[in-house]
A protein has these predicted regions:
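The conserved phosphate-sensing helix
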Residues: 177-191
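A short, basic N-terminal segment
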Residues: 1-36, 196-223
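Conserved AAA+ ATPase "SRH/arginine-finger" region at the nucleotide-binding site
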Residues: 122, 137-149
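Short regulatory helix/loop adjacent to the ATP-binding pocket of P-loop NTPases
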Residues: 121-135
Length: 223
């Protein structure tokens, strides 16, 4: 494993998506439904949607549902929770597989299927049969956190670690980084690691260095 891949693995493990570390904001009802799904109860079909960064993939991954390595899993006897992410990008073959999975779940009342995408059901470029089945259950638009909510949560998590985020650092993050919590918390994780390793308090230069390290590991820009 390369050094960059090991770094990304460590970063993923520190920030593995769970319901507990999802910041609900105005999505409290969705989190409640997902807690029910995790217990094997609640609606049989759920569709959630929103732009990249609002938490659709985070929520789906947090369910720890059955996966068989396929773009759309096959129904398997004994497995009761299935997820399909990015339904917007399904090609015709996988869309047909989703329709088959939808029908199988419908025939098994104990089973649950949760799908995610970027657009509301009506705007999806999918066969009508798939779209109508996505509408069998509940549909939620995942609302992004506003700037005040994002930085209030960032400050709360920083305080829990004994970190002080100065107004200067907040202003820099607000103007230079994507506005999703996953990115902000990953930068905080890395900056905290650097500060601890060097026995220094967190400063703006360390914050910038943390972003540079993440970008180098990702092979692209985090900004």
């Amino acid at each position: 494993m390369t050094e960059n891949n090991q770094y990304l693995l460590n970063l993923h493990q520190r920030r593995a998506p769970t319901l507990e570390n999802f910041v609900p904001g105005r999505n409290g009802e969705v989190v409640k439904v997902f807690r029910e799904l995790r217990r094997g109860v609640g609606p049989q079909f759920v569709y959630i949607f929103g732009p990249v960064g609002v938490g659709v993939t985070h929520l789906l991954t947090s369910l720890d549902a059955y996966q068989d390595g396929r773009r759309v899993p096959e129904f398997k006897s004994g497995e009761t929770l299935y997820i399909v992410d990015d339904v917007d990008s399904l090609d015709p073959g996988w869309a047909q597989q989703l329709l088959i999975l939808q029908n199988e779940v419908r025939r098994h009342p104990e089973a649950r299927l949760v799908c995610g995408g970027k657009e509301p059901i009506a705007q999806l470029d999918l066969p009508e049969g798939v779209k109508s089945r996505l509408g069998w259950g509940l549909s939620y638009a995942i609302e992004p956190l506003d700037e005040e909510e994002r930085f209030a949560e960032l400050e709360r998590q920083a305080r829990d670690r004994g970190i002080d985020i100065s107004p200067e650092m907040q202003a820099w993050m607000a103007s230079h980084l994507p506005r999703d919590m996953s990115t902000l918390l990953s930068v905080l994780d890395e900056a905290d690691r650097l500060a601890l390793a060097r026995h220094r308090r967190l400063t703006l230069p360390l914050l910038r260095e943390a972003v540079d390290i993440i970008e180098a590991a990702l092979g692209g820009s985090a900004r």
